[in-house]
Every structure is written in structure tokens, then in C-alpha cells.
């Protein structure tokens, strides 16, 4: 872009420079190339991934044949929202946990995927669609769970109209993938997805960028906002706080670029397409890179031949908010990365108080002189350096949370179950990922 275009772009956007936060620089970032095809032997839908489901009801049973997009379960509290199979095949197992909690529905895939066929719309047809028809298509097809509502980060309630919708076009988590590499090839689907979700609100649709993503994903007709700063600047909750805060009685929705792509493919191609590109990252990965896969695939199909050592933590998602799944687990519904780091089951002499040169420290309490090499990457393990401790008023939480919220007092009010104080201290604006750095 020319200097004049850059100045115009700056003036036409909301710009936020966030100083609070902390970038955890880890070894093992993915190079921008796609690895060999993964032979995906099995898949699973995990209701525990689907935020806000409290009473899942199965629609299929072991031995049932499926197509990609066949409804498998729904939540009794929102019976019209369907959760669908990512592939065609046969249900081979239903895994339950304590008190018969539904944990996984495992699927043996066909060699060639067969899809449930939905109505195909031209771009002219899309322009004339009504909100009710859009919602019905999204709910019955399996695409609706990509839309998340604030407060509390649940799957959106289709009976509520949000005051605005937000999409973050960058991820600031440790070792996060490049959205330019993941999604720039699907820009047309993203534009169609935006047309669709624009019909779901009377308010504005906000596209939130950093300096790397705004050139690729700045789309006219929507609010394009620019965020700069350390993690959690890429969290949509932080962005909502600065653009359109959630107060008592407010509802705001968010989705992701992948969610927009799924919506675009549904309306243009008439299918529920769960294919995605993810990155395999971490200091224990031989060659960190990107891979094409389908949501919910068995992680062992990829990681068994990719790890350097056996004693590792395999995480579906990022190291701050992902879930430890082991090498027999499955990729989470919302995850676009698999992180592998050393297991922290070894004890070191004097523990965290031992002065060393190779540790990352926010407070410079250890990791002597680490502040002299701010761009150094570290191989961190999962060791928490001790047991659970009481809150100590150090002021650190406030330094890593770029929001007008007092996290220490909010956490204490949550522990005390003081609902009035929670409301006053901003509980409606937060979900777990927004305060994950406080636990680092």
C-alpha cells in the first residue's frame, strides 16, 4: 500500500494500541508449508468441546450409517440447533464418563466422503434472504455452533438478536497459526459468510485485525478495526471490551474466519464441510508445519511419527487454553492447532528460585538477564512449580489483562459466589481465555 492509502486506512478504522499483556515466545513455530496428506483413521464429536451444552441428546446409535452433515445430537435446552457428523461413515463407539456423561461419539470414516445435500444459493439469492431463513439453514446444517455469544461464551441463542457481531482475524496465543496462510485462499467464502451473519444483527459487524492481517482481510462495508499489542490482543473478548463492551442485559456474538468459511460453503455449495488446515507446533515436534485435515480427526494419525521424545504433553489447541488429549485423543471442534511440549514431571534443584539463564520470566524474578533478549524463544514444560496457593496481591494480573477490570477482586468474588459483586466487577465481559495469562 502507498503512504496515502495507509493513512486513509488508519483514519477509517478504530485503532487500539494495547500495552498490557505478555507474549510467551516458545520454540517450534510452524513453517508456512503444508505437510503430507494425513491418513485419518477415525473421528469423534466431543460434546465437551461444544460450549454451553448441558443436556446433550443423541439422535444416532452404534452401527448407524452417517453422511457428512448428518445430525448426531442436540442440546435439550436448544432443540433446533443440530451438531453434525464431520464425515460419512459408521458410528463405532459412544464413550461415556462419570454419571454417564456423554464424552465422545466415535466414527469410522468412509474412503470417500458423502454429504448431506442442502439448498444451494446464488449470491443474488443470498442478498434477498430473510433472517429467519438464514437462522434455520445454519441451525439444521451443523454450522450454527461456530457462533458464540457473550456473556459467558456459550453457543449463541438463535432466539436472541445481538447488538453487534465480532470476528478476530488474528491469533496472538503462543505458536498460533498465521491466519493469512490458513484462510486467504478462502476469501470468497469469508465474504459470503459475512453477508449471511450481517443479516443476524441490526448492529455493526466488526472485523478486527493486526498489521499483518488487515491487508488480506480488510473488507469494505464492515467495521475494520486495528489492534496492536501483546497477547491477549487477538482475543475477541478483549476486542469487544474496547469496541462495544458487554453490560448487564447486552448480548454480543462472535465467530471465527473458519466459521465464516463454513457458512459460505454451506450457502454456495450446499454442504457441511468440516475440512480445515491446522498447524502442528511445539519444541517437541520434529518439523512444525501445517496440515490439511477434517475437524475431529484422531490425533495419533499425525503425532505418532512427528514427536521427538515420548514424555510429552499433547494439547488440542494452544498451550494456554487447549486441552491435554494424549496421543489417543481427537482434535477439538474449535481448535486450529496441536501443541506438543515437554511434560513437566521432573524436579530441579531449588525449583523456581534457582537463578538460571534459560527461563522465561515476566517479573524478572528468575531467568537472569532474560530481559536482554526479548525475542528469544524458549522450550517450556508443563511444570507449575508448586501446588495451589492463595491469592497474593502483587498487581501482576492487572499488568497482563488489557481491560478496565480488576481481576484479583473479580476472582475472589467468583470464589465467594457473590453475584452482585461479580456483575459490578465485569463478569459479563470475560471468558476463560481472556484471563488465561493470569495463570501462567
Name each region found by the language model.
Residues 73-76, 201:
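A generic secondary-structure signal for well-formed alpha-helical elements
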Residues 40-44, 55-57, 63, 67, ...:
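A common structural microfeature
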Residues 66, 72-73, 291, 299:
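Generic structural signal for buried aliphatic residues
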Residues 49-56, 60, 66-69, 78, ...:
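Generic structural motif
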Residues 37-40, 90-96:
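Short, solvent-exposed cationic patches
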Residues 81, 95-440:
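Buried, small/hydrophobic-residue-enriched core segments of structured protein domains
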Residues 2-59, 74, 224-227:
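N-terminal, Lys/Arg-enriched amphipathic/low-complexity engagement segments
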